[in-house]
Regions:
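Single conserved hydrophobic/aromatic residue that forms the stacking wall/gate
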Residues: 1-11
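Short coil/turn connectors at secondary-structure junctions
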Residues: 5, 36-38, 207
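Active-site-proximal loop->helix
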Residues: 12-33, 174-175
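Structural motif
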Residues: 22, 30, 39-41, 145-146, ...
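Carboxylate- and glycine-rich phosphate/diphosphate-binding segment that chelates Mg2+/Mn2+
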Residues: 29, 36-121
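C-terminal charged capping/lid subdomain of soluble metabolic enzymes
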Residues: 61-63, 163-242
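Active-site segments that bind and position negatively charged phosphate/pyrophosphate groups
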Residues: 81-191
Length: 242
């Protein structure tokens, strides 16, 4: 039987309870993998003290993602405790991980093999995030930093596509900043980013799909037309030159 002992923040609060493995290929991230539920997961917070700031922030990104998708209560708890989490307060860290793991475990229990659409919400921020990782070169940015950038992009895309409020965009930016996840000072040409997105495993029939937040705790999976994606990618690219 499979047993997992988690030593990394990102794994502990996210992939440890996903029951999924993935291998990165030159063409894209996690393009080969399988589903296998562990017999149990051991998550000791004591070893988190060994993580550097980059890996710590990486895990915080996945917790922030969970809070946006889950509920007002989780999100505003994160807003209230972001500074303490970034400072590694042990009580806050334990609570944040517990909330994130419960959220993901509940989602996975409903859709263990990504066949019902429920689990798609866990890809929030990952469509642009995976493209950033692939084009910048794996390891250039942490997975969490790339996902945080993808969350910023998806929220702004959501304003035009599903009516996401400007208040949500600003609140999410504030949370990510407080967790040590500033906007990346990096970009790639819009056409290259779109091509990388089309190689992502979430693409269907050539259509790039985004998880977009209508509101905190309310999301929609949308196949966004290429021209709309390119328009927003050009805005994103231009914002890096300011």
């Amino acid at each position: 039987s499979l047993r997992r002992r988690q030593r990394q923040m990102c794994i502990r609060d996210s992939s440890s309870v996903g029951g999924k493995t993935g291998v990165n290929l030159p063409e894209g991230k996690n393009l080969v993998g399988t589903f296998k539920q562990p017999a149990y997961v051991c998550a000791s917070t004591a070893v988190l003290a060994t993580l550097d700031d980059r890996e710590w922030a990486c895990g915080c990104a996945e917790i922030a993602k969970a809070s946006v998708i889950d509920s007002d209560e989780f999100f505003f708890w994160m807003m209230d405790h972001a500074s303490a989490l970034e400072a590694r307060d042990p009580v806050v860290v334990t609570e944040a991980i517990a909330r994130s793991v419960v959220f993901k475990a509940n989602v996975v229990a409903e859709d263990k093999t990504e066949s019902r659409g429920v689990r798609e919400c866990l890809n929030y921020g990952h469509t642009l995030g995976h493209a950033v990782e692939a084009l910048a070169g794996y390891g250039t940015f942490s997975h969490g930093a790339a996902v945080a950038e993808g969350m910023r992009f998806a929220a702004r895309l959501g304003v035009d596509v599903v009516g996401t409020s400007a208040e949500l965009v600003d609140a999410q930016d504030e949370l990510l900043d407080a967790l040590g996840l500033p906007a990346l000072a990096w970009s790639a040409p819009a056409e290259e980013m779109l091509a990388a997105m089309k190689r992502d495993k979430k693409t269907r029939a050539g259509e790039v799909r985004f998880v977009l937040p209508r509101d905190i705790g309310d999301w929609e999976l949308v196949a966004v037309p290429d021209e709309v994606i390119l328009e927003h990618l050009r805005r994103w690219e231009d914002s890096k030159s300011l």
